[in-house]
A protein has these predicted regions:
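Long, low-complexity, acidic/serine-threonine-proline-glutamine-glycine-rich intrinsically disordered tracts
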Residues: 160-232
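Exported/periplasmic cell-wall-interacting domains
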Residues: 67-186
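Extracytoplasmic
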Residues: 214-230, 239-301
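Bacterial signal peptide processing site
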Residues: 24-26
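C-terminal motif of bacterial Sec signal peptides marking the signal peptidase cleavage site
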Residues: 19-22
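Post-signal peptide N-terminal segment of mature Sec-exported envelope proteins
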Residues: 28-60
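N-terminal export leaders
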Residues: 9-13
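N-terminal secretory signal peptides that target proteins for export/translocation
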Residues: 1-6
Length: 301
C-alpha cells in the first residue's frame, strides 16, 4: 500500500512539473527573427517580399487598429501599440524606416516588424504610438514619404536568426512588381504650421543603449520637425520601357503615359490623376485593380 501511494505521489509530481513546464513554454517571450517570406495575397492583391535597403516610397499611411494589440506579428514578436513599429507589404523584417508626414513635416524612425497594411491603397501601417507622434489620427490617412535607414537595417538583420522554414521561389505566385520612387522636394514647399525652423525636436528619448542595441525592441521617440510638403495624389498603375505599351495601358484604364528618367533612356509610367481627395484616390485605385493592374498603388507627387 505504501509503495503504491509513493508511486502515485511521484506520478502527480511529474504531472505538476510537466504542467509548469508547459506554462513556462507558453509564457515565454517570442523570439524575433529575420525574414523576407514568400509571395502572399492580402486585400485582394499579391505582394512579393524582397530585401531592399534602398527603398524610398510615397503614399498614404494607415494606423493599426486596436484589435491587433497582443497578436503575433509576422517576424515572431507580439504587437504592442505603444512601440514605434510598422507594417509594410514587401520589406525584409525587421527594417528601420524613416517616416515623414508630408502634411506637417514631422519625421520619425519606426521598426518594420509585420506585413500589411491590409488596405492596398496604403503604403505603411503605423502603430498607435508612432501615428500619434507623427500627428496621424486613427482611422485617417496621411501623405507620407518612407525611406529605409540602410545602415541601421543591415545591423538589425545581422543580429537576428533566419527563419527555420525554407523560402519558396517567387515564381510560385503570379508575377508582380515592386515600384520605387524618389520624392524630389516640392518647389512650392511651405513651412509646417507653427514651425519656424528645421531643428530636431526631441519629445522623449528612451534610455541609453544596451548590449541588445542590434535588436532594439524600443526605438527612441525622437521626432524631427521639418517643412510640410503636401503633394497631389495619383494612382500609379505600372512602368514600361516602351511608350506604346504605356499608352496602351493608359487608354484601357483612363490614365496617361508619362516619360521620366534621363534623356535617351526614358521609361514610361501610367498614372491617373491628380486626384482631389483620399476617397477619390481609393476609388480610382479600386477601379484600376479591378481592371487587372495588380501592381497599381497610390503615390504622392
Amino acid at each position: 500500500m505504501t509503495g503504491a501511494m509513493a508511486l502515485a505521489r511521484r506520478g502527480l509530481a511529474l504531472l505538476a512539473l510537466g504542467a509548469l513546464a508547459g506554462c513556462a513554454r507558453r509564457g515565454a517571450a517570442p523570439q524575433p527573427r529575420y525574414m523576407v517570406g514568400d509571395p502572399y495575397r492580402l486585400g485582394g492583391v499579391w505582394s512579393y517580399p524582397r530585401e531592399d535597403f534602398g527603398l524610398v516610397q510615397t503614399g498614404l499611411a494607415a494606423v493599426a487598429a486596436d484589435r491587433r494589440a497582443g497578436r503575433r506579428m509576422s517576424n515572431g514578436e507580439v504587437h504592442d501599440p505603444a512601440l514605434l513599429t510598422a507594417g509594410h507589404r514587401t520589406l525584409q523584417l525587421p527594417a528601420i524606416l524613416c517616416v515623414t508626414n508630408l502634411e506637417n513635416g514631422l519625421t520619425l524612425d519606426v521598426r518594420v516588424n509585420d506585413r500589411g497594411p491590409p488596405h492596398p491603397g496604403r503604403v505603411v501601417e503605423l502603430s498607435r504610438r508612432a501615428a500619434d507622434l507623427l500627428g496621424i489620427r486613427p482611422g485617417g490617412a496621411a501623405q507620407v514619404r518612407i525611406a529605409v535607414v540602410a545602415e541601421a537595417s543591415r545591423a538589425l538583420a545581422a543580429g537576428l536568426p533566419d527563419p527555420e522554414t525554407p523560402r519558396l521561389d517567387i515564381s510560385a505566385a503570379p508575377l508582380g512588381a515592386v515600384e520605387r520612387e524618389d520624392l524630389a522636394p516640392s518647389p512650392g514647399a511651405v513651412p509646417a504650421r507653427g514651425i519656424r525652423d528645421a531643428r530636431p525636436l526631441v519629445r522623449e528619448t528612451a534610455g541609453p543603449p544596451t548590449a541588445a542595441a542590434t535588436t532594439p525592441q524600443r526605438l527612441p521617440e525622437r521626432v524631427t520637425r521639418g517643412f510640410a510638403q503636401p503633394g497631389r495624389l495619383f494612382v500609379e498603375a505600372a512602368t514600361f520601357g516602351r511608350r506604346d505599351l504605356a499608352q496602351q495601358q493608359a487608354a484601357g484604364i483612363g490614365g496617361r503615359a508619362e516619360a521620366f528618367g534621363p534623356r535617351g533612356r526614358e521609361n514610361f509610367r501610367v498614372r491617373i490623376g491628380p486626384l482631389t481627395s483620399v476617397e477619390q484616390a481609393d476609388l480610382a485605385l479600386e477601379r484600376t485593380l479591378r481592371a487587372g493592374v495588380s501592381e497599381a498603388r497610390i503615390v504622392v507627387d
